[in-house]
């Protein structure tokens, strides 16, 4: 959360399974649409919160399976655990609040007396969450009796039934809604309350999110009967809650548009960027657009044309070079030439590219340092490069950006593990310094600005080397 300098423009709080993630969409099309929209327009000044019933381990399994963005805050285990940032730092204060009138041992003891309660897997059992499966016809009676018994034992608990099968026993002060209320209270105390908050869900355990005052809410089109019944009984007259006509992440995008919370046309919905004018152009938008073009080129979703390649080269400065994660350094025009030969090499097969954690900082009058995690998915395989880009805005067209240099390193554990040419040597050729200094000098930029770029790259673990051995990009097969 510290990455934002002021009040968040928008905070999206979304459930994962069957809300952000559509398990009936093997190509993850709606999720990738949301990803592109968020990274292009919202990441710099907004907050993304995932609120899930999954435990931390189960959440990580989903991240390994699906192209999920990195959220600013993760609320897990039905609102009993809150973690911040990429490193998922736990909120100890929240844990201490939940300890009041809670004894997990007593809960386990009392629930063991109900043979119809089938314990969920060990991965889903947490310090403040005891979870079971139970048939819907038996659930209501069990909830009434169990609540009474636990109250007699001196506990103050909440029992949530969702998805027509899952029963969770939590501390009274827990739950997705209470976790969100706690976060909003913290933001208000710090003077950083988001200008708008949009909550999104599909099942019974998301009802609490929609109950929070002064938030907008979206029930995705595939919302379960239990949530729709709750809405009909409690929130039908609340104009700040809609039942979307689109499934999952597409329904979230629909909610953004319905409540006029900001841009709601994903870059993935734009067929021809040259013919489409957008109101917000930023370094982050340029990165999203570039890698979307790269995906479409490899999949032959756009026709092969020298015109496309000429336009692509116009994005790069004549001095621009790319350092591949293998350590290979190439002039960017060579990379474009190699890319031209790869047109349609993934046609008819699943090949997807998306970016995560896009950030940009202005380090000169017209110079930006852009960082992102660039992911590629080839069927069951996923690779990720941490990418650092130096960009300059065109003086005559300040909303257009020129790429001066690109440096990539493998994200630990997410590189290619097969040929030796893929080894993540993380080198910077000293000649690269000369190229960037020449480019910055030609553009009347301070050498300190170029130095800032290299300090940033070196901080990611790159190593200076006098000479890099050339490796054919045909061996590497990924020019960008």
Can you annotate each of these PLM segments?
Residues 2-11, 170, 177-279:
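Mg2+-dependent phosphoryl-transfer enzymes with acidic/Ser/Thr/Gly-rich catalytic loops
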Residues 5-7, 42-45, 68-69, 123-124, ...:
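Short helix-terminating capping/connector loops at secondary-structure junctions
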Residues 8-25:
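Asp-based phosphoryl-transfer active-site loop
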Residues 29-124, 222:
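Active-site phosphate-binding/coordination module
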Residues 62-65, 144-147, 227-235:
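Short, aromatic/basic amphipathic alpha-helical patches
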Residues 107-213:
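Conserved acidic, metal-coordinating active-site core of Asp-based
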Residues 163, 234-236, 364:
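Residue-level recognition of beta-strand termini and adjacent short loop/turns
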Residues 276-299, 306, 321-440, 453, ...:
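A beta-strand edge to alpha-helix "cap/lid" segment located at domain peripheries
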């Amino acid at each position: 959360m510290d990455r934002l300098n002021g009040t968040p423009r928008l905070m999206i709080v979304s459930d994962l399974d069957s809300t952000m993630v559509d398990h009936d969409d093997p190509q993850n099309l709606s999720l990738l649409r949301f990803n592109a929209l968020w990274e292009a327009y919202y990441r710099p000044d907004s907050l993304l919160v995932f609120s899930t019933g999954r435990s931390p381990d189960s959440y990580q399994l989903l991240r390994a399976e699906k192209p999920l963005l990195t959220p600013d805050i993760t609320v897990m285990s039905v609102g009993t655990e809150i973690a911040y940032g990429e490193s998922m730092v736990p909120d100890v204060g929240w844990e201490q609040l939940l300890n009041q009138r809670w004894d997990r041992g007593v809960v386990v003891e009392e629930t063991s007396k109900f043979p119809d309660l089938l314990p969920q897997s060990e991965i889903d059992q947490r310090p403040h969450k005891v979870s079971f499966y139970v048939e819907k016809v038996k659930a209501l009676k069990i909830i009434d009796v169990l609540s009474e018994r636990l109250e007699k034992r001196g506990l103050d608990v909440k029992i949530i039934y969702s998805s027509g099968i899952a029963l969770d026993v939590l501390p009274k002060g827990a739950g997705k809604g209470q976790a969100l209320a706690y976060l909003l209270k913290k933001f208000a105390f710090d003077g950083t309350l988001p200008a708008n908050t949009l909550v999104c869900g599909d099942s019974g355990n998301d009802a609490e999110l929609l109950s929070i005052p002064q938030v907008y809410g979206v029930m995705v089109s595939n919302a379960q009967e239990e949530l729709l019944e709750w809405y009909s009984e409690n929130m039908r007259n609340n104009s700040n809650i809609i039942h979307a006509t689109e499934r999952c992440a597409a329904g979230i995008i629909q909610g953004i548009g319905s409540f006029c919370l900001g841009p709601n046309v994903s870059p993935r919905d734009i067929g021809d960027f040259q013919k489409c004018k957008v109101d917000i152009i930023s370094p982050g938008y340029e990165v999203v657009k570039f890698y979307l073009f790269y995906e479409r080129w490899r999949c032959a979703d756009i026709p092969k044309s020298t015109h496309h390649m000429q336009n692509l080269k116009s994005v790069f400065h004549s001095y621009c070079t790319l350092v591949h994660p293998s350590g290979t350094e190439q002039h960017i025009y060579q990379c474009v030439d190699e890319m031209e030969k790869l047109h349609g090499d993934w046609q008819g097969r699943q090949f997807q590219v998306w970016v995560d954690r896009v950030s940009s900082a202005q380090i000169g009058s017209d110079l930006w340092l852009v960082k992102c995690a660039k992911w590629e998915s080839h069927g069951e395989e996923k690779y990720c490069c941490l990418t650092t880009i130096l960009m300059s805005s065109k003086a005559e067209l300040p909303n257009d950006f020129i790429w001066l240099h690109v440096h990539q390193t493998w994200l630990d554990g997410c590189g290619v593990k097969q040929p030796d040419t893929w080894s993540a040597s993380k080198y910077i050729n000293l000649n690269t310094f000369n190229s960037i200094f020449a480019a910055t000098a030609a553009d009347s930029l301070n050498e300190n600005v170029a130095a800032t770029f290299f300090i940033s790259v070196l901080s990611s673990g790159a190593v200076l080397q006098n000479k890099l051995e050339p490796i054919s990009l045909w061996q590497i097969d990924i020019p960008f």
